[in-house]
Design a protein with these regions (language model features):
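Terminal helix/beta-alpha structural elements that buttress the NAD(P)+-binding lobe
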Residues: 1-178
Length: 178
């Protein structure tokens, strides 16, 4: 999970090109990618506002989010309640696309893991995150390893299965939420 999801999160944050003190919003925050975005963003000195269900709110806070808002189609409105001028960047792990763009300030940056390019509105910088672009850049993975060793990133394990329980593990993975 660290090489794939952690590097994908690192790539997204690098594409957003935010500086310490700026604000990033994270959708799909309870997922592996979203969780890494939160933790790496905090290590980078960013302010993090993240979405979550009521059941996941404590998890998202424990990962370091400064503000947690309820997820859903009107998440952009809830983000703007905290940041009326909009956030500087969005890491869209929930693939909300045009539903979350209103939370972004004019000239902000949007990172998509599914290649969403927007329509060029409000001078927004739309980026596509492809982890393969970090192929061979071992220093990126090494920096994540260091964050783990420093305690800035926690590795989450949903459950442990015995080999004979592999079918149950696959069913759980296919059901989502792991």
């Amino acid at each position: 999970t660290l090489p794939m999801n952690g590097l994908t999160a690192r790539r997204s944050l690098d594409l957003l090109d935010l500086s310490a003190g700026q604000i990033v919003a994270v959708t799909g925050a309870a997922g592996a990618y979203g969780g890494y975005i939160i933790q790496i963003a905090k290590a980078d000195g960013l302010t993090v506002i993240a979405d979550a269900s009521e059941a996941d709110e404590a998890l998202i806070k424990s990962l370091g989010a400064d503000i947690v808002v309820r997820r859903g189609e009107d998440v952009a409105t809830r983000i703007r309640e905290h940041f009326p001028d909009g956030v500087d960047g969005i890491a869209d792990g929930a693939v909300l696309k045009e539903l979350v763009i209103p939370a972004l300030c004019d000239g902000g940056s949007f990172a998509s893991v599914r290649g969403y390019e927007g329509d060029g509105q409000r001078d927004i910088n739309f980026t596509k995150t492809f982890v393969r672009e970090y192929d061979g850049e071992t220093e990126k993975l090494d920096s994540l390893r260091q964050l783990v060793e420093d305690g800035a990133i926690t590795l989450r394990v949903a459950d442990i299965f015995k080999p004979e329980d592999a079918p149950a593990a696959h069913r759980r993975l296919e059901a989502g939420g792991t």
